[in-house]
Amino acid sequence: DALFALGGGVTGDLTGFAAATYQRGIAFFQIPTTLLAAVDSSVGGKTAINLPEGKNQVGAFYQPMAVFCDPDTLGTLPDEEYRCGCAEVIKYAVLGDAEFFDFLEAENIRDNEEEVIAHCVKMKRDIVQADEFDKGKRKLLNLGHTIGHAVEKLSGFEISHGDAVAIGMAAVVRKCNDGKRVIGLLEKYGLPTVCPYS
């Protein structure tokens, strides 16, 4: 028996959680079809579902057998959905890869999808290998997510995950030395940088 998660982050999370809990765990495979899932949620084994009380309230750490990513599927995404994945890509650049940050400022993600996806997956792989269960270094991957999850909840989940993470990152870096550069990069990709709630 095996499950296949063909879709975005929600599909991957739900499928991974079902695979982790059905018969105490069966094989599953991730086949991400969104940029966000390709660079982030399909990799690393975090699976969770939302409850009315908040995001990712019930879940498990459960690794897929493999992740298969075909960048051609990203061409079918509406601009808004594609933009959401850009927030997660930028997160990796902000986490300490100055060369990647410079690349994202100078180039366009859409024109360099394979290279960008491979770079983000490698960064996440390295972090997860060092801290699979989110006890230390992996917490860096939550950049923008604490505030972002609150924004999502306050909006009744009308604000997308990517937009909420962008708002969260902007809030966190606003007073940092390179905060203006980070906010400028988010804005380059059409991401919001101001929280609509006070």
Where do the language-model regions lie?
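Anion-binding (especially nucleotide phosphate/pyrophosphate-binding) glycine-rich loop
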Residues: 1-25
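Single, functionally critical "micro-switch" positions that shape active/binding sites
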Residues: 8, 31, 69, 143-144
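Gly/Ser/Thr-rich beta-alpha loop segments that engage phosphate groups in nucleotides
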Residues: 9-14, 46-47, 61, 146, ...
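A glycine/threonine-rich phosphate-anchoring loop and its flanking beta-alpha core
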Residues: 16-107
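Active-site segments that bind and position negatively charged phosphate/pyrophosphate groups
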Residues: 103, 107-197
